[in-house]
Amino acid sequence: MSRLPSEDTLLEVNIEDIRVSPFQPRRTFLEEDLKELVLSIKTVGLIHPPVVREIRNGDKVLYYELIAGERRWRALQLAGYKTVPVVLKQVLADDMAAEATLIENIQRVNLNPLEMAEAFRRLIVVFGLTQDKVAKKVGKKRSTVANYLRLFSLPQEVQEKMNSGEISLGHAKVILSLEDENLRQILSQKIISCKLAVREAEMEAKRLVKGKGASLKEDSSSQPSSRLGFCQERLATTFGYPVTVKPQGRRICVSFFVEGEEALEALEKALTTSSSEAILT
């Protein structure tokens, strides 16, 4: 066992004693990428050990929770390693460990766009940070954070296709450039069914807007749809969850889509702590 300059500890642990953080935003690990990493580890060794913290019950260590390096840990498992060197962080409270996990993942380039958006969302909802504070913590512009959060206003099918890599961030930006929700749905379906390139999607978006004189800013009959689209996008960006805003007779129905009790509690907290000014600005 040796000491690092930061006073964190370098040690060898059983690979089966390591667990994934519940705050890990990354959900997609491509097998081909892991195989390439396995080859690299076998060739040059493990240059950067995973970073963990201890989860204890009194004096007993129950397991080690990953703060950084899940991809490396998975590659080591695939390579058949039984033990693995890790950097053991000194005692971290749950909130500090969760924040460190999210920030470490954001600062890496291998998250897909929706995983990045999810990491930003958790920092905002779970830790009560503003978009400005999130941007400063992760070294990005506020506009970058806001643009990623806008992805939650995309149709659910588009989000699924983004997770699978069938639709890129470039495609998403083209879809979001349309103000009308119906046109977004039409363009999304066209991108998916025809496998349009980003440039082709841009041309199709222009055609849709011009096709029926449908520029929402010029067509007064489309103003209600434009207003609902604005509200939907603003709510999704502010709270970081997929949301729909649809007319039902004389009423407007706002629906949030969350998975599990933890997400529901986080949304409830966000709804009770967010001011109207934060939503509308």
Curated annotation (Swiss-Prot):
SMART domains: ParB (SM00470)
Keywords, comma-separated and alphabetical: Chromosome partition, DNA-binding
Cellular component, GO, one term: chromosome
UniProt record, GO biological process: chromosome segregation; positive regulation of sporulation resulting in formation of a cellular spore
MF-aspect GO terms: DNA binding
Swiss-Prot/TrEMBL induction comment: In infected human monocytes transcripts are present by day 1 post-infection and last for the 7 days of the experiment. In patients with confirmed synovial Chlamydia infections, 6/8 had transcripts. In infected human Hep-2 cells, transcripts are visible from 11-48 hours post-infection.
Pfam families referenced in this protein's UniProt entry, alphabetically: HTH_ParB, ParBc
SUPFAM superfamilies linked: ParB/Sulfiredoxin (SSF110849)
Protein family per UniProt: Belongs to the ParB family.
Function field: Involved in chromosome partition. Localize to both poles of the predivisional cell following completion of DNA replication. Binds to the DNA origin of replication.
Listed name of the protein: Probable chromosome-partitioning protein ParB
Gene behind this protein: parB
